[in-house]
Structures are given as C-alpha cells and as structure tokens.
Amino acid sequence: MKGPAFSKPLKDKINPWGPLIVLGILIRAGVSVQHDSPHQVFNVTWRVTNLMTGQTANATSLLGTMTDAFPMLHFDLCDLIGDDWDETGLECRTPGGRKRARTFDFYVCPGHTVPTGCGGPREGYCGKWGCETTGQAYWKPSSSWDLISLKRGNTPKDRGPCYDSSVSSGVQGATPGGRCNPLVLKFTDAGKKASWDSPKVWGLRLYRPTGIDPVTRFSLTRQVLNIGPRIPIGPNPVIIGQLPPSRPVQVRLPRPPQPPPTGAASMVPGTAPPSQQPGTGDRLLNLVQGAYQALNLTNPDKTQECWLCLVSGPPYYEGVAVLGTNSNHTSALKEKCCFYADHTGLVRDSMAKLRKRLTQRQKLFESSQGWFEGSFNRSPWFTTLISTIMGLLIILLLLLILLLWTLHS
C-alpha cells in the first residue's frame, strides 16, 4: 500500500535559509528603529529639476528633522521653460520673451499619481480638464490630495524690465538672468506626510486661449544626509565646577567694633576673598528655591505642605508640588531628589531636620487647641471611654423616665 505523496519527513520540508531570513529581518528592523528617531536632525536638500533640459531650477538645503524640513522653494518660471519652448514661439532667451511669459496663466498636473485619462509625459499629465491640482489661473485649480502647491510670487505682472543684470547692468530693476517670473512652491499637509524616497514628477502647461498649451515637466527630489555621529547627552561642558551643594552658612551676630590699640599703625584693609563659584548642587537647589518662592507668592495656600522635586527628564528641570499628608509621595512620583517645604521654607539638611520641623509644627498646632479638644487628640482611649459612659447614662436615663411614667400611671 502506497503512502500519500505528501508524507515526507518533516525535516525535508524545513527551509534551510529560514533562520538566516529571520535574522536578517530582525537586523533590518533594529537598524530602522535606530535611525528612525523623529528627533534626529539631518541635512535635507530639496531639488527642483527641469526634466526637459536637465537643469536645476532650485536647490535648497537646511538642517531639520524628517517631519519639519519642508521649506518654501523659490524659483523662476523661465527655469522650467528654458531658452526655447516647443514650436509655439514662447521662450525666455530675450527680455521680451520673459516678459511675455508673465502674461500667461499656468496649471500643474501630478505625474506621481496619474488619474485615469490624464495622459502621460507628452501631455504633461494634463490630458483632460480636471487633472490639474494647482497653478495660477483664473479658475483657481486646487486639490486636497496633491503634495505641493505652485503659485506665482509677489512680483506684479506689469512691473519689471526682465533684463539680465549681467548684460544690462545699467538698467534699473534688472535681475540676475533676467528672472521676472517668480514662483513659490509650498508643501501641503499631504506632502508633509508623504514618502519622498524617490523623485516626484509634475507637468506644467501655459494656458493659451487658442492653440495648444505648451508643456514642460519638472521633478522634486529630497536628499537626506546624516550630519555626523550623534553627540551623547551628558553634563554641560561649559558649566565648570561640578561640586556638591554647600552646607547652609550659620548666621552669626556681628561683634561690636573694638578701637585699635594706642600707637598701633593703621592697617590697610585687605581685599575680600573672591566668592566661590556655585557648584552644580547649589544651582539645582536654587531651582527648587525659585520654584518654592514662585509657588509661595502666587498660591501661598499650596505651600502649607508640599514636596518639590527635581524632574531630571530633558529638556528642563521642573518643580512639582504635591499636596496632602506627609506620606511617601516621592515614591509615587518615582523621584529621588525631593524636598519638603512649608511656610517656613525648604528643608534641605536631612530627614532629622525634617522631623524636627514637623514636630515643631505639631506642637504649634496643639498649642492652639483647647484642653478638652487636645485631650481627645492625646488619648485615643479617652474617646472610647467617654462614648461608653455616655451610652450607659443615656440608657439609665431612659429607664428612669419609663419607671416614673409607669408609677405615675
């Protein structure tokens, strides 16, 4: 009796490359997690390229993260048209041609996502009306899903000679290259969330009432460079004197001045020793002291009993106040650098000093109470005794009243 065809041993079905594939996936995931920190700063370069001529219309570099490095890009329409544009006679070779280009509206169609019927590169992805997503035209083309918006700059159409300053330097208003058709490219919300791992392409067409609208195409590319190894986070190298906090200075009463002895030469007072630079501990304690003073001035009722803690998480040290009894609030906050404070100030010496201050506060509280109220606080059993005696007296009084009422009736 023959066995089924799929009854081979299990070891023959195991892929020998399986462990290596799993290891490669884990390594790749670890690398991606290491380099995909949203706070890492890169050198980001955006480049606008005329695909008809291969020339760069704009190249802008800046430092930023992958979520905020989206600047406005400024370039000229003639950088996309070139010296000669198709067979329509439009060109940017002469001042007159550049000035004429300012009189036309334009519209832009995306090539990275081409809707049905919008054509290909030959049509500039604008094969029919409705494919345009942005531009500067009387019908105001727009889109809610495209990655960019492209509009004219703030130069009015009826101003500017469009003369090249390198050729006609004596003409007022001449610009480098005769550029007088400024464009502004902005990233939309969809563009800031999109993936820019590969270039994105758009088609641009000048609108003419009659004839064929001339076509050009441009691409937008992002290049990301690592600015170098990350600097480890640690103590500020500028702050010198990483010293522990100094002990509080004991205040001494000034001694009365003594007259100099007779015949003694007058002594020139020496210069005072320079004050010691505060250490790191003093700086941190000053932060807590400042937080206490601000809290005591703004909300004095909240400084009756509170804990002020140094939160060591970047980017700042913060004062945290917790109201309540003198329980272990610091463990709930998971802090190791907390100071108890009340209206008398911060306690920074030791827990013994803290207990002493709490004892003084308790004595002050008890001294403000009457003897009867204080007896209840000092003797817990006294409350139970009084309650028991009062209960028995009330029962006896009720029995006596019931007995008198029975005899009377």
From Swiss-Prot:
Keyword Signal attached: yes
Membrane topology: Single-pass type I membrane protein
Virion surface-side positions: 33-384
Main localization category: host cell
Compartments, record wording: Host endoplasmic reticulum membrane; Host cell membrane; Virion membrane
Stretch forming the signal peptide: 1-32
Residue intervals annotated with topology Intravirion: 406-409
InterPro entries, per database record: FMuLV_rcpt-bd, TLV/ENV_coat_polyprotein
Glycosylation: residue positions: N43, N58, N296, N328
A single BP term in Gene Ontology: virion attachment to host cell
The protein's assembly and partners: Homooligomer. Forms heterooligomers with mouse EPOR, probably via their respective transmembrane domains. Forms covalent heterodimers with mouse MST1R isoform sf-Stk, probably via disulfide bonds.
Protein name, entry field: Glycoprotein 55
Protein's organism: Friend spleen focus-forming virus (isolate 502)
